């Protein structure tokens, strides 16, 4: 069997009302998706994520080769990432294709640890304390074992007050995670990230509120600073979602930068490297639970990796109604991904990622290019 075609398609929907992502100073009035489709014989694999910038013209590096030669393909994708954008959605599509051929879900191909993944509700917008407290109570009632709250107020004390209100609303028996979003910025954001003392002050204040982890409290390349913060903090330090190089992620391990490692399979590692890194992370008695914020295919790819590899207490499930719902998030899927029960999702035994794209349905949303819009 040989790879016959690779096709990249872009789609966009309008968001009305807009989604106010805590990490983006501009309201998001559209949501753009890129799908990579790989075909071999009667089989089709799909993946999504970044816009695959720079990939056009390099299809010949893969066409005509065995889709199961994944080590080779990952090396080439690593090369392309150095010269262009992040092309890991192609590797996800290849795993989906391999699963279709083998008649097995990706989570079984990777090890088959379990089909059930516990979820935490990942909120994306900053809300006033009372509104976030109400949201937290609703999420607790739905059975989520944890929720993530985003920071980014100009006055960090206001962010702390939101967490305090949520803790008072839900009590001590639901975990709160906090994402400071200081590791990277949008292209149009010129603000400076926290310094070490700000991060340490926040960590101490959040520890007093029983917060489970503080995510991305410093710039993503401050390996030593993150390690020192972890040493001094009274709560877990999390991060690593977007470092492009596998060597960067192993450098975190060398320095002991994190308690919780979160490399996203479509942002920085791909699936094969995720398997390698998860083993190292968990051997170091740390938590491996990937970041996942995007569409349903991105979520599925990370959930399959979690099911196969992660012993984490929960995995990320982007959910912050009314402006970020499964229906918006998963518009490229035939149906949105929903929890199977209170605070968990059961992955199917269907081959590959377990979904079939309805290309005809998506045609109304198709666009020529998948680059981000600044407003």
Regions picked out by a protein language model, each given a short descriptive name:
Residues 1-18, 25-27, 31-33, 41, ...:
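Flexible C-terminal active-site loop/helix
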Residues 3, 90, 103, 147, ...:
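Conserved, mostly hydrophobic/aromatic
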Residues 5, 38-102:
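Metal- or metallocofactor-binding catalytic centers and their adjacent structured scaffolds
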Residues 49, 121-123, 149-151, 174, ...:
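A cross-domain feature marking catalytic cores of carbohydrate-active enzymes
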Residues 65, 69-72, 210, 219-238, ...:
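Shared catalytic-loop signature of beta/alpha-barrel
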Residues 91-126, 173:
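Glycine-rich, aromatic-flanked loop segments that form ligand/cofactor-binding clefts
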Residues 116-233:
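Metal-dependent enolase-superfamily TIM-barrel catalytic cores that perform enediolate-based chemistry
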